[in-house]
Amino acid sequence: MLEGTLRTLAGQGIAKVSARTVAAAAGVNQALVFYHFGSMDELLAAACRHGAEERVARYRGRLAEVTSLSGLLAIGREIHDTERRAGHVALIGQMLAGAQTHARLGPATAAGLDLWITEIELVLRRVLSATPFGEFADPEGLARAIAASFVGLELYEGADSEGAGRALDALQQLADLVAAVDGLGPVAQRAVRARLRRSVARPERASRSAE
């Protein structure tokens, strides 16, 4: 029934999701929807969580092997292309649209995104720890920004595929810059760290002065 709900969402849109259409997709009696879940909102929330858990589990092993930002971006591109072809991009769009009117779907969609964010954060902590950026970066915040960027790109691509491609290329350039800094010798890396410390300290001093 959860898979039937996801297929209905992706294929017909949130406006067409009902006990009847879900039951037809799942090949069951529609009375079972309310017997097992109580309401359509509860079914939608459960299906959203189920779908996210399945997708994250599929890529968890690959993400655990990533050793660089370029590697993270490479698997991100692969996930993007695979999920778009499988129809999961349309599913994300429908869940985000449904979150505006279905009270339970908003938290469930956020929880699903949090599963991705957790995995991305683990990668960022690992790959940034040995770079000059490790002590200054906010892995959790960056993970949320990356997840939000890819969701946005997945939705944006439907309107402007060329623009979405350029955005991904720009992310690759940023990853290449980080890799270039990481490839510097010890002396140069110490200079970069010192410069970053001064840059971070200036806003903090300005903030204290304003208080």
Task: Describe these PLM feature segments.
Residues 37, 95-101:
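Short helix-capping/turn signature of helix-turn-helix
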Residues 4-42, 46:
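Helix-turn-helix
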Residues 106-110, 127-203:
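Hydrophobic/aromatic-rich alpha-helical bundle segments in the mid-to-C-terminal region
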Residues 1-6, 22, 47-51, 55, ...:
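Generic hydrophobic, amphipathic alpha-helix propensity
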Residues 46, 57-89, 139-146:
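Hydrophobic alpha-helical connector segments
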Residues 203-211:
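C-terminal regulatory/effector modules of DNA-binding transcriptional regulators
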Residues 49-55, 64-66, 181-182, 187:
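N-terminal hydrophobic signal/anchor transmembrane helix of membrane proteins
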